[in-house]
Amino acid sequence: MNMKKLIIILNILSLFILTGCENKKDVNYNSDIKVNGPVLKISLIQTAYEIYELHIKNTNNEPIDNLYDGSSRDAKKHYKWLIKTYKNLDSDMIKRLENIFESNSSWAYINSSINLDDSSSTSDIVNNLISDKNLDLSSDVENDIEVFFNHFNNEYFNKYFNKRKSSLEKKASKLNNILYSNDVNIEEFINKVCGVSLNTNYVCTFYYSLNPISSQNFEYENYIISTISPNTTVKDLLRVPFHKYSHALFDSFNESDEFLEICELLKADCKLVSVYNDSNNLAYDFNEWCEENLVEGFSKYLDYRYSQYEYDFSNFVYDLDFYNYLRKINFNPDKVNLKDACIDFYMTCIDF
């Protein structure tokens, strides 16, 4: 074998490795999805909250460290950095950190900053938070935000962030190369599976975060924004748009008499009601809770149809059951529409 042929073969093998040896007929990825490296407007707040959650919020000393230890080597290093940084904070800074996140959640602060430019500085972030009336900050907390985040970034976070940023930007570039080279439209795929036409014009944007154990989702205008952990794969990215697009499908019938009637009957379902009550009713009313179980189940089904990923875990009460139901009936919109499939499924839950 001459050297030229060897180089060609090696190039082909490297392409298969990069794409995970997937058959493009089975797994295709939407090039409308964009992956970015970490940005300060997210990671500064998110990482400060991790320190708060580990050392201040976790008053019961629950073994959160197990979540980091069970993730990856980088996750363990990140956990050690969080521990070391907290130990170096003086009592005044710890109190300011506590005041900040007792006043608002990490999500609320990042949501306030999410439409800032990706190159925004600490000063830009602080000024935005202080001026945001929706956060309803007291003058004391405004001062805490200004003092703490500037100190935290200058003394600890800036060096750590820049050290991690380069490698995560390289990962983002690799994922984008895969996404762009497999130019398939998720919306068109859903239209084919469901037999309906969507026109959502959503733009899905992902930002790598330093947090290895959790993610956050945000929306503004037509943008769907999610943070992703450092070990996220291309397949993981698809689950967010699948869930969001599913909501658009359910919007076509979630106010229909038939759907509202089944939601009323489900108020007799002890398990569904119990989990709903335990969630403090903050995110949904009961009808929306019934819908959310179906949406999550349907998004799982879409992911299965798209990538052949088989689910065995539940996020709500009936999402996994609905996913399995759709697989069992081999859901076909030419035979049964989505609304009828949802109502038929919930009727089996009520009958049981």
Outline where the language-model segments fall:
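Sec-dependent signal peptide recognition
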Residues: K4-N11
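C-terminal motif of bacterial Sec signal peptides marking the signal peptidase cleavage site
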Residues: I17-G20
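Post-HExxH zinc-binding segment in Zn-dependent metallohydrolases
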Residues: D26-A108, F253-L320
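Long, mid-chain structured domain cores
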Residues: K84-S181
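Auxiliary, metal-adjacent structural segments of Zn-dependent hydrolase domains
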Residues: Y160-F218
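Second-shell loop/turn segments in exported
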Residues: K171-Y180, I228, N280-F286
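Active-site recognition of the HExxH zinc-binding catalytic motif
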Residues: K235-S256
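Pan-zinc metallopeptidase signature
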Residues: G297-F352
